[in-house]
From Swiss-Prot:
Disulfide links within the chain: none
Cofactor: [4Fe-4S] cluster
Function: Component of the dark-operative protochlorophyllide reductase (DPOR) that uses Mg-ATP and reduced ferredoxin to reduce ring D of protochlorophyllide (Pchlide) to form chlorophyllide a (Chlide). This reaction is light-independent. The L component serves as a unique electron donor to the NB-component of the complex, and binds Mg-ATP.
Protein's name in the database: Light-independent protochlorophyllide reductase iron-sulfur ATP-binding protein
Keyword Endoplasmic reticulum among UniProt keywords: no
Residues the record lists as binding [4Fe-4S] cluster: 97, 131
GO biological process, one term: photosynthesis, dark reaction
Keywords (A to Z) from UniProt: 4Fe-4S, ATP-binding, Bacteriochlorophyll biosynthesis, Chlorophyll biosynthesis, Iron, Iron-sulfur, Magnesium, Metal-binding, Nucleotide-binding, Oxidoreductase, Photosynthesis
Gene Ontology MF, one: ATP binding
Matches recorded under PANTHER family: LIGHT-INDEPENDENT PROTOCHLOROPHYLLIDE REDUCTASE IRON-SULFUR ATP-BINDING PROTEIN
Catalytic activity: chlorophyllide a + oxidized 2[4Fe-4S]-[ferredoxin] + 2 ADP + 2 phosphate = protochlorophyllide a + reduced 2[4Fe-4S]-[ferredoxin] + 2 ATP + 2 H2O
Organismal lineage: Bacteria, Pseudomonadati, Chlorobiota, Chlorobiia, Chlorobiales
Organism in which the protein naturally occurs: Chlorobium limicola (strain DSM 245 / NBRC 103803 / 6330)
Length: 275
């Protein structure tokens, strides 16, 4: 049975880069991993495969949406460390529902019997306020992971995601594994002071602290995971948090919680008082 992860966070927070590096860390520790990009931009797997691969929606269009005519080879590309990548895709900008495509991708995975093929399935999901379609991965996930930075907008989005996870946990098995602090900067960004307080308030923990480092940004543009980049100063330190996350997830029963989110209005007044 696959370990299913759903990675969420505010738009532009670094979810795909973080997801790809978590997938890489897991794969290098021996896990067979499938990463699923759930964003119309279809660039989640770019650091893994080094290209923008064909999306599920594009493959379905080619067969007039007859799922039974598709095989795994039509929608899956294998990249770094043997990681398989799949991109849900989406409708043209300004039309259609991207969340619907996520649901279609989940259906296709089930029909192809892929849930039993992998040790880990990681959904990299668009969005900070989760609609029905984009929340679909939470129906299947064992654990949700929130990516956040040490600022109000990111924390507000994380709190909204905690609301979605709490709601889904009533009917489904999903729990929150924790928050990954991304782009941590102790010089100008306050480190993780606000994230630490938020995590304690909602009943979760910081899984790891990913530093703000130019090498991570460069790896994204290069179409590589950080693990695949040439050795250079700072690389080893940047790899530490991704390996910490992988080690945590590969435990027999990783500790996780159902978060207790803060009310929308309450969080505005509360965060303003955090230092």
């Amino acid at each position: 049975m696959s370990l299913v992860l759903a990675v969420y966070g505010k738009g532009g927070i670094g979810k795909s880069t973080t997801s790809a590096n978590i997938s890489a860390a897991l794969a290098l520790k021996g896990a067979k991993v499938l990463q699923i990009g759930c964003d119309p931009k279809h660039d989640s797997t770019f650091p893994i495969t080094g290209k923008l691969q064909k999306t599920v929606i594009e493959a379905l269009e080619e067969v007039d949406f007859h799922h039974e005519e598709l095989t795994a080879d039509d929608v899956i590309e294998t990249g770094f460390a043997g990681i398989d990548g799949l991109e849900a895709g989406g409708p043209p900008a300004g039309s259609g529902c991207g969340g619907y495509v996520v649901g279609e991708s989940v259906t296709l995975l089930q029909e192809l019997g892929l849930y039993d093929k992998y040790d880990v399935i990681l959904f990299d999901v668009l969005g900070d306020v989760v609609c029905g379609g984009f929340s679909a991965p939470l129906n299947y996930a064992d654990y949700a992971i929130i990516i956040a930075t040490n600022d109000f907008d990111s924390i507000f989005a994380a709190n909204r995601l905690c609301m979605a996870i709490q709601q889904k946990s009533v009917r489904y098995k999903v729990k929150l594994a924790g928050i990954v602090a991304n782009r941590v900067d102790y010089t100008t960004g306050g480190g993780t002071n606000m994230l630490d307080q938020f995590a304690e308030k909602v009943g979760t923990r910081l899984l790891a602290k990913v530093p703000y480092h130019e090498l991570i940004r460069k790896s994204r543009f290069a179409g590589k995971t950080l693990f695949a980049m040439e050795d250079q100063p700072g690389k080893d330190d940047c790899l530490v948090p991704y390996n910490e996350i992988a080690d945590f997830l590969m435990q027999e029963n990783p500790a996780a919680t159902v978060p207790v989110p803060i009310g929308d209005r309450e969080i505005f007044s509360m965060v303003g008082g955090w230092q």
